[in-house]
Amino acid sequence: MKKMLTLLLSAGLVASIFGVMPAAAAPTVVNSTIVVPKGTTYDGQGKTFVANPSTLGDGSQAENQKPVFRLEAGATLKNVIIGAPAADGVHCYGNCNISNVVWQDVGEDALTLKSSGTVNITGGAAYKAYDKVFQINAAGTINIKNFRADDIGKLVRQNGGTTFTVNMTLDNSNISNVKDAIMRTDSSSSQGRITNTRYSKVPTLFKGFASGKTSQSGNTQY
């Protein structure tokens, strides 16, 4: 009885601080790609979005699926959960900012850079990526910070066989259960840097980079 009273008092204290939490809302089903216009911000306010598999794709490894979100140059996507099916996740056309976006079950890819630019990813997470999380299809830079990834093939992959330059950085993150590598390229000019990151069950940090094109510091294997 005393234990039960303590639990009730604790629950009451939490409720008084945070208020009564409503039941989780049903995911928003996206029938056609949500376009975030140039220079604007889309704040999902923590809501979950899933693709309509009939119109966007079923989140398998099938090519040419459509994205749930399309970001035009300079756009920002934040506070979004992308559930399953995720189709082809997020497409960035030029510079884009991704803040606190979680991919619960990565589809074809979590995010693809479709035209040259810089992708800044801060916070968030990605899980269950059969192949790659972030696909880079154009010259540019991808900066990833404070990110969590688990059960993935690769974290960052430059489009296979391409020779353009991609600069990849990963900082203060936690990466685990990787099948291939954290960063992979086939380009002799691309660069990769991993700092202050914890990782576990990762075969290799870098794959395909030319000599002298990778660096690391402050990382911890666990």
UniProtKB/Swiss-Prot annotation:
Q: What is its EC number?
A: 4.2.2.2, 4.2.2.10
Q: Which cysteines are cross-linked by disulfides? A: none
Q: Where does the record place it?
A: Secreted
The cofactor(s) it depends on are: Ca(2+)
Asked if the keyword Signal belongs to this entry, the reply reads yes
Q: Which GO terms describe its cellular component?
A: extracellular region
Q: How does activity depend on temperature?
A: Optimum temperature is 45 degrees Celsius.
Provide the GO biological process annotations.
pectin catabolic process
Name the catalysed reactions: Eliminative cleavage of (1->4)-alpha-D-galacturonan to give oligosaccharides with 4-deoxy-alpha-D-galact-4-enuronosyl groups at their non-reducing ends; Eliminative cleavage of (1->4)-alpha-D-galacturonan methyl ester to give oligosaccharides with 4-deoxy-6-O-methyl-alpha-D-galact-4-enuronosyl groups at their non-reducing ends
Give the Gene3D superfamilies listed for this entry.
Answer: Single-stranded right-handed beta-helix, Pectin lyase-like
Q: Which GO terms describe its molecular function?
A: calcium ion binding; pectate lyase activity; pectin lyase activity
User: Which of the seven top EC classes does this enzyme belong to?
Assistant: lyase
Which InterPro entries did the record assign? Pectate_lyase_PlyH/PlyE-like, Pectin_lyas_fold, Pectin_lyase_fold/virulence
Q: Which domain of life is it from?
A: Bacteria
Q: What metabolic or biological pathway is this protein involved in?
A: Glycan metabolism; pectin degradation
**What pH-dependence text does the entry carry?**
Optimum pH is 10.5.
Please state the protein's primary subcellular location: secreted
Q: Quick one: signal sequence residues?
A: 1-26
* Cited function: Catalyzes the depolymerization of both polygalacturonate and pectins with low (20-34%) and high (90%) levels of methyl esterification, with an endo mode of action. In contrast to the majority of pectate lyases, displays high activity on highly methylated pectins. Does not show xylanase and cellulase activity.
Stated family: Belongs to the polysaccharide lyase 3 family.
* Protein's UniProt name: Pectate lyase A
Q: Which organism is it from?
A: Paenibacillus amylolyticus
